[in-house]
Amino acid sequence: MLLDAGPQYPAIGVTTFGSSRHHSAADVTDREVGLGINPFADGMGAFKLNPGGHELASAGQTAFTSQAPGYAAALGHHHHPPHVGSYSSAAFNSTRDFLFRNRGFGEAAAASAQHSLFASAAGGFGGPHGHGDAAGHILFPGLHEQAAGHASPNVVNGQMRLGFSGDMYGRAEQYGQVTSPRSEHYASSQLHGYGHMNMNMAAHHGAGAFFRYMRQPIKQELICKWIEPEQLANPKKSCNKTFSTMHELVTHVTVEHVGGPEQSNHICFWEECPREGKPFKAKYKLVNHIRVHTGEKPFPCPFPGCGKVFARSENLKIHKRTHTGEKPFKCEFEGCDRRFANSSDRKKHMHVHTSDKPYLCKMCDKSYTHPSSLRKHMKVHESSSQGSQPSPAASSGYESSTPPTIVSPSTENQTASSLSPSSSAGHHTASHSTLTSNFNEWYV
């Protein structure tokens, strides 16, 4: 399979190894050698990713043939380490000498080369400095925390596969003397923004790095305020045992205080209970009542995203109808098709048909069939008490609902002409107050 890589990429040291081009020294001098390792990088050319069977025989040879002759020629007037010249005797081979030499997975890959694009593995370069067994030096270091003996699935015969890591490429150990800690620090800082590109990087920190910054749960202490009957004498002494979870508190109250079926009196002895010793008819009613004191709500809404919890299963059953849209309670009045989700809403609605007005205003003699109407009426009293002292008719809020008499313009003009300016202004003010009061009564 052939891969046409397209344009020239001298910055990452990729060259057209298989091409038969020849370059003069003048052409080489014009190139900007600082962009890459190989100054002859005209383009990526054709990469043969799957070597043939006859190519596997040369697996013992060098996997990456250096282009040092051109490198040395291009660096003619520059200062460079003397070991660079050791590569001048290497032959100019094709792309297959650069890429994979074996289909099997090698285990000689160094751990520091697992996250680079072109990383030389152990024994890849033999040099005069005795680094034949050294690992490739990574120009852009990634996460290199794995053990050296652990084989990476991206290593093929000591060479890193042309992968999709976030790091760019690796240099041989012999080139390591050219770099400096300052340049490596700069490269690491510049590569920090490419973290999202690296699809082969393992999550070394795990979930701990995230949970470290989560808010720690506040430890709550739940106190039992049950008072035993034999300790009701002054001063009263409550249980005062503390618990860290609601389950422990509820279990303690149920087992130690409420008791089993042998208990005949189902009385709540919680501290400052408003029932004041009034018994329940059944044990389950006492258990449900104790949830008012403990705050237990063991019935959560099963619908996702709701998050509401309830102390009684009956309340949960009614609440679920808001999600399902079920309205099983139909109005019993003939000809009315209104339906309701619970019986209490239906009972409030029935007052419309029976003309019952059980909701009385405590400030006046008005009564209404629905509590919402009473709440609207109470706003009339609130607004009148907050404002300036208006006329008695406007402050009462329950005057006659008869609309005011419509006055013709001629009559109004005659009345205005017969009054003095001051009395005329007072007359208009009183009329306006009466209209406002009556309109408020209409909206109630």
Curated annotation (Swiss-Prot):
Record's keyword terms, sorted: Activator, Cytoplasm, Developmental protein, Differentiation, DNA-binding, Metal-binding, Neurogenesis, Nucleus, Repeat, Transcription, Transcription regulation, Zinc, Zinc-finger
PROSITE patterns found in the cross-reference section: ZINC_FINGER_C2H2_1, ZINC_FINGER_C2H2_2
C2H2-type zinc finger segments: 222-257, 271-293, 299-323, 329-353, 359-381
Compositionally biased intervals (Low complexity): 383-432
One record GO biological process: inner ear morphogenesis
Biological role stated in the UniProt entry: Acts as a transcriptional activator. Involved in neurogenesis. Plays important roles in the early stage of organogenesis of the CNS, as well as during dorsal spinal cord development and maturation of the cerebellum. Binds to the minimal GLI-consensus sequence 5'-TGGGTGGTC-3'.
PANTHER family in alphabetical order: GLIS FAMILY ZINC FINGER 2, TRANSCRIPTIONAL ACTIVATOR CUBITUS INTERRUPTUS
Descriptive protein name: Zinc finger protein ZIC 1
Lineage per the UniProt record: Eukaryota, Metazoa, Chordata, Craniata, Vertebrata
